[in-house]
Amino acid sequence: RHPPARAAPGRLRPGTSAAVICTVLLTTLVFGLGMNVSRVRSRSTRPLHDLALYYLPFATGLRPLEVARLTVGDYLLEDGSVRRESRVRADVAINGRDRPLFFNHRRLDEALGAYLDERIRAGHGLGAAEHWRGLDPLGPLFLGSEGEVYPITPNGREGQNRYVCRPLLEIYRKIFRQADIPGLCTQSARLTLMSRMYERGADEDQVGLVLGIADRSAVREQLPRPLPELA
């Protein structure tokens, strides 16, 4: 059995901004990830790459295809600092709708920073040395072990406009096996994020904004908001 993540004190107030929601939630979630992070680190052949990937769905609700489409410039500013308030661009989002994306936690910064440092040492995806930490801002945030771009291929019938990044999907399956949490997948990570948002007092609109779900009813279908207990 795996204990639930520790809850940070306090609840979100109505109207709390999406940026504050994500900051509070990631702070809460990482309390429960420590043991699993250690397993991933010790079992992975690419621990820096895989740890950064492991944190992302819990922190942001991003899907594997969206992760594959992220660029260095989505995460970094030109001066090399973290882009705290970013966007899931329309051409990145699975549903084709732009939405907010926040990078607001030290441990996620450390994981992504260590991975990008490793890329620089390996000479993968480099750009001008004085900008974006020396990386190409238009290049993918995550690359394969030899610096190759993860391929994104059509998935479904012609004209359906559906795509998949199969290598990254398989990497995520491997990472979650290494974490040794039965049933864990990127969708369950998204549901975990939704659950924590509800626990903090977020409503369906706030959940949908962060996770890229436009319809309140679709949010409820994935994970209904718990009803308040009667006194």
Give the role of each language-model region.
Residues 32-60, 64, 190:
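Basic, Lys/Arg- and aromatic-enriched nucleic-acid-binding interface segment
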Residues 105-181:
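Active-site/catalytic core of tyrosine-dependent DNA strand-transfer enzymes
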Residues 1-33, 148, 154-156:
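Flexible interdomain linker/hinge and immediately adjacent N-terminus
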Residues 211-231:
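Catalytic-site neighborhood detector that most strongly recognizes the C-terminal catalytic loop/helix
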Residues 160-161, 166-209, 213, 228:
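Short, basic (Lys/Arg/His-rich) helix/loop patches that form interaction surfaces
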Residues 1-12, 19-20, 61-65, 113-126, ...:
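N-terminal DNA-binding recognition helix of tyrosine site-specific recombinases/integrases
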Residues 57-82, 205-209:
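Short, charged phosphate-coordinating catalytic segments
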Residues 69-109, 120, 125-131:
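Conserved tyrosine-mediated DNA breakage-rejoining catalytic core shared by Y-recombinases
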